[in-house]
Amino acid sequence: MTSGELANLAHLRRARDLMDRDYARPLDVPAMARAALMSPAHFSRQFRAAYGETPYGYLMTRRIERAKALLRRGDRSVTEVCLEVGCTSLGSFSARFTEVVGESPSAYRARDHRAGATVPACVAKAWTRPERTSRNGEATG
C-alpha cells in the first residue's frame, strides 16, 4: 500500500469516526466528505471501495444498531427512538429498520430480550450488529 493510499484511508477513517460519534446529528455526504478532506463524489466512491457500503448506508447501520439497543430497553416508543438516533421520518426509519433487521421496530421492541441481558456489552454489540437481509429474509453479504 502506498503512502497516498494510507493517507486516503486515514481521511476516510476520520469521516467514519464522525459517523460513529455523531450518528444522531444531521449528517449528509457533503459534511462527511469535508471531514475526509474530499469532494462528495470522490468521498462516496472511496468510502464504498474501502468499506463495502455507501457512507449513508454505514451511517444508517450505526443508527439502526443504536436503535436496537434503545428498543431492547423497552422504555421508549419507536417514535422516540427514531428521533433519538437522528432519523426525522418515522416511515423511512421503520422501512430501513425492517430492511436491515428483518422485522419492524415495534416487533423487535415487543420481543423478549432478557436472554441477552447477561452477555457482556462487547459481545452483545457484535451479536446484535444489524445484518442487511434480502426480501426473502436471507442474510446478504
Which residues fall in each region the model found?
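Alpha-helical bundle regulatory/interaction domains
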Residues: 1-42, 49-50, 54, 66-141
